[in-house]
Amino acid sequence: MAALGKAEESQGCFGLFLLLPGPSMQPRLFVLVALSVLLLSGRAGALTEGLYCGRQVCYDVLGVSRDASKGDIARAYRQLARKYHPDRYRPGEPPGPDGETRESAQEKFLLVATAYETLKDEETRKDYDYMLDHPEEYYRHYYHYYSRRLAPKVDVRIVILVSVCAISIFQYYSWWSSYNEAINYLATVTKYRIQAMEIAKQQGLLNRTKEKGKNRRSKEEIKSEEEEIIRDIIKNKIDIKGGYQKPQIFDILLFQIILFPYYIFKYISWYVHWIYTFNIQGKEYGEEEKLYLIRRNMKMSQSQFDTLEEHRKNSFLEQKLWIKENYEVYKLEQEEEMKKKMASDPRWKRYRRWMKNEGPGRLTFADD
């Protein structure tokens, strides 16, 4: 087929040469046409250089036709692999009856293996057949060949799964670290420490640390055990909200992805129930629904809203902030109150005075 392409190109160039006028221009044009033919023929002959089986056809290497099945290709490969396997030849051994040496057999074995690797995969075989049928698409063949060779062999799904698991493990341990950090901080706060000590005395937990006799311990051991008791009481009695709350296994990324369909179904069910109950039937909001609307108006997350004290939530309910108009009035009042505080705050006064007199410092590259 490549030879046929060369012949057609040569004939086309020769026809162009015959149609060109002027005897004085013929030598120059002859050189131009000859160079074009040489370049085109060289490119056509190098179409498969360095790709797949090189200048040989992979089907011919295995001795099969282009219509051969995977089974036929595998059988031909096994037969030729046994024949040309380098282990059958010793180094320095003279050529056998078939004229093969260890070096030539190794070259043929590698060529047979390359042909088999090319034809056993459906996608690679399609690319190779396309190259045989369209040798003129030189750069396309190079792109497809090396894109497959350099493509990662690991399944992308495995990479994603491992990444999600790694992120989930990091999340879980970092959350535990933040939670323990919060507990250690609360154990140093006088208010919570005194309450924890009172609870420990009522439960008789501190009396055990001051045992005498054989079980007597050093002051450092007693102090360490008391600290551990206080930390345990704070863990059990104080409900920490927000970013320092106690980690839950179902909050990590892996379980969030697994439970995502459930959360979607739950949200749709809740939304349909809300529309039917309050928009269609016209029922009044309960306390939970009112707090949800207040939180949505304030654009706060659930964890942020949970950190608010109960008296503030009750104040929001008394002001009926679930109603949009009431919330807008409340928002303006809060902004005005904040402006008054800033105006009377000595620190803000000093800052405004400094900005007025001196202003922020400037960077300059001018020479003094």
Swiss-Prot record:
Main location: membrane
One GO cellular component, as annotated: membrane
Membrane topology, record value: Multi-pass membrane protein
GO biological process: protein folding
Keywords: Chaperone, Membrane, Transmembrane, Transmembrane helix
Subcellular location: Membrane
Domain J stretches: 57-132
Bilayer-spanning residue ranges: 25-47, 158-178, 252-272
Keyword flag Transmembrane: yes
Keyword check for Transmembrane helix: yes
Family under the similarity heading: Belongs to the DNAJC25 family.
Protein name: DnaJ homolog subfamily C member 25
Organism ancestry: Eukaryota, Metazoa, Chordata, Craniata, Vertebrata
Gene assigned in the entry: dnajc25
